[in-house]
């Protein structure tokens, strides 16, 4: 389960921001997770609670904003939405797609005290 390691990375980011911003408690963490990122949101929620137990993010709410996948079709030169890497272009049916979005996971915002 790589979500545990991802949550540990999130805590590192939160703690680094706490040092920079001089806050002592995190109330909410907003994450953007791309549809093509291979991150399971429910597994991430479970791991987040365990990993944050003894940190400044203990008890913090985890809000997940799911981002759609997108790609550029080399066949018809259009930007299209995709939900899986092997999807066909919704405009022309081509499988010659170059992924342009939806692969990332990032901390978007923190609510702190």
From Swiss-Prot:
Keywords: Metal-binding, Nickel, Zinc. Coiled coil: none annotated. GO terms for molecular function: nickel cation binding; zinc ion binding. It comes from the Bacteria. Pfam families: HypA. InterPro entries: Hydgase_Ni_incorp_HypA/HybF_CS, HypA/HybF. Zn(2+) binds at residues 73, 76, 89, 92. Ni(2+) binds at residue 2. GO terms for biological process: protein maturation; protein modification process. Involved in the maturation of [NiFe] hydrogenases. Required for nickel insertion into the metal center of the hydrogenase. NCBIfam families: hypA. PANTHER family: HYDROGENASE MATURATION FACTOR HYPA. Belongs to the HypA/HybF family. This is Hydrogenase maturation factor HypA.
């Amino acid at each position: 389960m790589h979500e545990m390691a991802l949550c540990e990375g999130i805590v590192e980011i939160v703690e680094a921001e706490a040092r920079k911003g001089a806050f002592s408690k995190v109330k909410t963490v907003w994450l953007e997770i791309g549809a093509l990122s291979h991150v399971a949101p429910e597994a991430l929620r479970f791991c987040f609670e365990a990993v944050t137990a003894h940190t400044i993010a203990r008890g913090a709410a985890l809000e997940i904003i799911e981002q759609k996948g997108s790609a550029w079709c080399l066949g018809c030169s259009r930007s299209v939405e995709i939900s899986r890497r092997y999807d066909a272009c919704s405009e022309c049916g081509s499988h010659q797609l170059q992924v342009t979005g939806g692969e990332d996971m990032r901390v978007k915002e923190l609510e702190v005290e």
